[in-house]
Amino acid sequence: MSFMNMESADLLPYGLGSPELVEFQNGYFVCKDICSDLACLDALLKENGFRLRLESAYRPFEKQLSIWNRKARGELALLDEFGKPMQRPQDEEELMYAILTWSALPGASRHHLGTDIDVVDGNACPEGYEVQLTPDECTGMFAKFHKFLDARFAANGAFGFSRVFVPGRGKIKPEGWHIAHLPTSRRLLEGFSLDTLRRIYEATDIACKRVILARLDSLAEDFIYPYFI
């Protein structure tokens, strides 16, 4: 995609442009600036009996847009606040908010920064099990893994990584599996502009476009800015 003759670097806060990425694990790419700290976290987890397994990493705008539109069309499952499948609302605004329960607006998911990853403990994953990234997994098979991470995050002992989607912050449901390298993501988000995101949406075939554009200011207060930490 090309928007408004902007430079590639100016589009990076939205998942457009050409970030410097490195493959870290099994086809998952991350921002090159986090690789050293991510390797340290990987080694720390290994020393304590865990195996860091990535389930998602860099996700460009186009991929986020595809996920959003497929959820809007009913091609991907919509989950309620408890992580259970729900019926697709017919009202456009209700549909938008249903998607936002677990999915960020395209260009505002943080995954496009290359600093955020979804993680589980590979050692605790049963053979053949397809990870769903749900709250039940965090409190079930991966509970020990997340408890260890919680302690490291609380002590600022996770090499710059921490959780972003936590209880009491914004209106996206907590995602225990989603961690971010905060020093790098803060730097990359400095160039973010809601007006630019609005112009990108105006030029994009995004589901629920009318209501997104009409509500974008309030959506940003609830679903974007709280996660700029």
Model segments located where?
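Cell-envelope/glycan interface and biosynthesis
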Residues: 2-229
